[in-house]
């Protein structure tokens, strides 16, 4: 799923990604905290661009990012 400022979210895909994150995790609570922490980071990162209204909420964006990282670990730096 391509994440851009002007795209809309496929809610079924988002639900599947969230379910996959939780299903593959060993601790549902920590997964939820990771999603919330990433969303908080993204919210403050996007704070500078207040004039650009994003159609994707920070929690939705964090689920997509964490799901992509889980499914494609070779894309991670380091």
UniProtKB/Swiss-Prot annotation:
UniProt keyword list: DNA-directed RNA polymerase, Nucleotidyltransferase, Transcription, Transferase
**One GO BP:** DNA-templated transcription
Q: Name one GO molecular function term.
A: DNA-directed RNA polymerase activity
What reaction does this catalyse? RNA(n) + a ribonucleoside 5'-triphosphate = RNA(n+1) + diphosphate
Q: What is its EC number?
A: 2.7.7.6
What do we know about how this protein assembles, alone or with others? In cyanobacteria the RNAP catalytic core is composed of 2 alpha, 1 beta, 1 beta', 1 gamma and 1 omega subunit. When a sigma factor is associated with the core the holoenzyme is formed, which can initiate transcription.
Give the protein name, as stated in the record: DNA-directed RNA polymerase subunit omega
Source organism: Prochlorococcus marinus (strain MIT 9515)
């Amino acid at each position: 799923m391509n994440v851009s400022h002007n795209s809309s979210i496929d809610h079924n895909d988002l639900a599947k990604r969230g379910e996959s994150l939780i299903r593959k995790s060993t601790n549902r609570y920590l997964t939820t905290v990771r999603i919330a922490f990433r969303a908080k980071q993204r919210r403050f990162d996007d704070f500078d661009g207040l004039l650009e209204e994003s159609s994707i909420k920070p929690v939705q964006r964090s689920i997509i990012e964490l799901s992509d990282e889980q499914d494609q670990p070779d894309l991670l730096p380091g």
